[in-house]
Amino acid sequence: CRDLQDRLVMIARVSDAGAFVNTNALTLKRSHGDYSVMQLLYDGSEIKAVLDFVNAGEVPIAWELIRSYSYMDCTFNAARLAAYTNEYRRYAEVSMDDLRYMPYLYLGQLLSSTYGYKQYLQTGDEELLAFGRWRTEMCRYLIANAGEVSAELVRLA
């Protein structure tokens, strides 16, 4: 599988470059960590409850921002990510380190996860395979563009 081969090459490349993020420099916030619209229960147009089976914990806010942005937009655009992040910054602090390391953190998290592929092999669900492939495409984009994304986030802050 080309995706698996590419992921192994990307992991080696990132590891050799020492690009994995020191999370001690990042702002931590209490959060669930993987909100999804699939977890929202509605009564008409009003959210009535959030269904979840995982406890909240402290996660890097950079992770929450880039993950939620990428699931919403599906195509990666540094200027739109910066606008999304700047809107959040109107309500809560996001440090320059959070912005600088955001794409590297996301790349490291995505590279270390087989989510989508493993579930596809267990269930045969094509949507899970598509999700795994989408995440690998995101890794390909970030391995080539993380530096530019990082610089754009800091520049537009």
Q: Which stretches of residues belong to each language-model region?
A:
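Hydrophobic packing residues in well-ordered alpha-helices of helical domains and bundles
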Residues: 1-7, 81, 132-135
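Helix N-cap / loop-to-helix initiation motif
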Residues: 94-98
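Active-site catalytic-loop/activation-segment of kinase and kinase-like phosphoryl-transfer enzymes
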Residues: 1-19
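ATP/Mg2+ or Mg2+-diphosphate-binding catalytic cores
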Residues: 113-157
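Active-site acidic catalytic loop and adjacent metal/ATP-binding pocket
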Residues: 15-63
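Active-site activation/catalytic loop segments of kinase-like enzymes and analogous catalytic loops
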Residues: 62-93, 107-126
